[in-house]
Design a protein with these regions (language model features):
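N-terminal acidic, proline/glycine-rich, low-complexity intrinsically disordered segments
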Residues: 1-5
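N-terminal secretory/targeting leader peptides
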Residues: 8, 13-38, 42-138, 147-357
Length: 357
């Protein structure tokens, strides 16, 4: 009896072991399948971000910068990541865009760093210090390789915002009146923004802040005598040349436009979508800047040959005033703090290497 009992117990034990192995195998297979399920779920995730632009829909940059970014992002993510685009003022405009992005009202916007100079010590350098650099590639180098964008984000990220340069471009003034002297220039009221306000004021003009969609009317009705919105591309797309035929050279300076993103919204993206987005923005900065230079040449040719635009050099007296103003602005930027001083050192070092200082 004892022997039969032992046999039955052994049989039960072996059966239990077999059942245990089968259950363990089932569990293992289920566990192994989990990453695939998660992966499939992530692959199926679809995201649509509202993007508030500071560009009016008539602006060349709305279509050639933002709309192209949206198109490429949708293509590269197989339709999983879409951008819903809003022109200037549809949700917010100008300086307000930073706050609606920071608060998460919209996850993304475009902006001129000149609208938010007080948000980071090096923001003025990211916007562009008037009268310092002379080519777009120099601004690109300062922004990316010499670290100015990174310096700005050191202060913005803790506030919940990431800024990424969109393109570097020249800033040039268009005027209703032809000027030939410092006295002529000192009589002007001009629309401006950022550190360009101080730069123009130092040379005697009376700069004013006017929102993008309102600039054309301000020029045409005489509220201002001229404006800058980029350079030739902006003047053509915003129709400034219809009412202001004098295009001034050289450039007041070189600036960056930028994308701003809510950090929490960025971090919520599936890793693959986040990677695609960040890589595309970085790629587009270089491609768009170079493309913009060709568009500048085409736009200015159109203005001169078809619209009666005249390219006018700034009088020597005005250029001397600009030179002094540039140095004063640079000193003010440097005095903003340790981060700003580091950025100014990078800028002045570059200028020295280029023979500008």
């Amino acid at each position: 009896m004892t022997e039969k009992k032992n046999i039955r117990e052994n049989e039960m034990f072996e059966t239990a072991k077999a059942l245990g192995r089968r259950e363990l195998l089932k569990g293992s297979l289920a566990l192994a399948a989990t990453p695939a399920i998660v992966s499939t779920a992530r692959a199926d995730t679809k995201v649509t971000w509202k993007v508030q632009a500071h560009w009016p829909k008539a602006s060349g940059s709305f279509n050639d910068s933002l709309a192209v970014l949206a198109k490429l992002l949708e293509e590269r993510t197989d339709g999983r990541f879409k951008l819903e685009l809003y022109g200037a003022g549809e949700i917010a405009k100008d300086r307000e865009i930073y706050n609606v992005v920071r608060r998460g009202v919209v996850p993304m916007g475009t902006i001129s760093p000149g609208y938010i100079l007080g948000e980071a010590q090096a923001m003025g350098l990211l916007y562009g210090t008037p009268g310092t650099l002379r080519e777009s590639w120099e601004m690109m180098h300062l922004t990316k390789n010499l670290g100015v964008e990174k310096m700005v984000n050191e202060e913005l990220k803790p506030k919940g915002v990431l800024i990424m340069a969109e393109k570097a471009y020249p800033t040039e003034l268009v005027l209703k009146k032809k000027i030939t002297s410092l006295a002529d220039f000192s009589s002007l009221k001009v629309r401006s923004a950022g550190t360009m306000l101080e730069y123009l004021a130092a040379a005697g003009a009376s700069p004013q802040q006017v929102a993008g969609p309102e600039i054309y009317q301000a020029i045409s009705t005489g509220v201002v005598d001229g404006a800058h919105w980029g350079a030739a591309v902006g003047a053509l797309s915003m129709k400034f040349w219809e009412v202001a035929k004098y295009h001034m050279k050289p450039a007041l300076g070189f600036a960056n436009d930028a994308y701003i993103v809510n950090v929490a919204a960025l971090n919520k993206l599936p890793p693959d979508l986040r990677l695609q987005f960040l890589a595309l923005v970085e790629e587009r900065y270089f491609l768009r800047t170079v493309e913009y230079l060709q568009q500048e040449a085409r736009a200015l040719t159109t203005g001169k040959t078809k619209m009666g635009v005249e390219v006018v050099p700034f009088p020597d007296e005005v250029m001397k005033k600009f030179g002094a103003a540039s140095q004063a602005i640079l000193k003010k930027e440097e005095a903003k703090g340790e981060i700003a001083a580091k950025g100014c050192k990078a800028l002045t070092g570059l200028m020295s290497d280029l023979g500008y200082a």
